[in-house]
Amino acid sequence: MRFWLLLLLGSCLHAQSGENVLLVVNRNVPVSRQIADYYRPRRSVPPKNVCTIDTTGDEEIQWGVYEQQIERPIGDCLKRAGLVEKVLYIVTTMGVPLKVDGPGARDLAEHASVDSELALLYGKLKGQRYPRMGGVRNPFFMRRDSAFQHPAFPIYLVTRLAAYDLADVQAMIDRSLEARNRGKFVIDLQSEKDEPGNDWLRTAAMLLPARRVVLDETTRPLYNQTAVIGYASWGSNDDHRTQRLLHFQWLPGAIAAEFVSTSARTFRRPPDSWAPNTDWADKSRYFAGTPQGLVADLIHEGVTGASGNTYEPYLEACVRPDYLLPAYHQGRNLAESYYLSLPSLSWQSVILGDPLCALKP
């Protein structure tokens, strides 16, 4: 029985195309239109699958703006084009607002990433209602043997084409088209942390081919690795990390995940002199509100897909590398690999990359 299930799953993994993508463009931001114009022909996204919205170019917005200028128009696009079921992936572009501000903390928080909130749109179009406070359990989380399809999983998988600038986004798209299943998976623990994150990293290493894994359990962060196709670590939360950039040689299709709370808080480029750090007391070392690293640095350096967070998600809601890396290695596309590893929606996650990117043999 399991053999036939896996055979069916395998056929579904490679069946998705640009017809399953809704591309969201902000009419008021030129770079948003430029990214859409670059991406659409390369993935054969039909014209009816392009949804143009009229909203601010600010990264942070309030709930009224989100509901009236983002969620409602995107829902209208899906219904008008008859795409509610057909579309599985929503792709936002740089210039579409990034995060929604709100009060509270931990389980009472009412702030979220725009993309994570949009993941619930399918359910909302079917009449489902969700609380604004806190996260919502992701029904696709840990479903290793399940094909992602509607209505079995009543969500959209939302990814974002964003980076420091247009050139970085275009390069990321180009790399997604050249992804191949080769290279190393680099997994870097912080040995002094006795936390579940280290267990997830070790498990990820065990679930990947041993000959392709570089697992480091020392206190020394890994830099200057070559031929990297997958990476997971504590990022700038590693107390021993001193360099802003990893200086890896990333292969086309490479993905990354770091346990960093606010790495997708902005896509503004910091000064070259700035470096992430763990000193929360010294606000002179902050950039865009915190001292933590930025996921856009990974894209700039050559990563094809990466996860980050807009506000504090807490470790238990971060992307799980023990699900992400094996799923991607086994042939899942980028969007499904990340959402398979993501515990909560309507929360803080931002998934960067082309959802259709998958490792070819």
What are these model-predicted stretches?
Residues 3-12:
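Sec-dependent N-terminal signal peptides
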Residues 16-361:
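Cysteine-dependent hydrolase recognition
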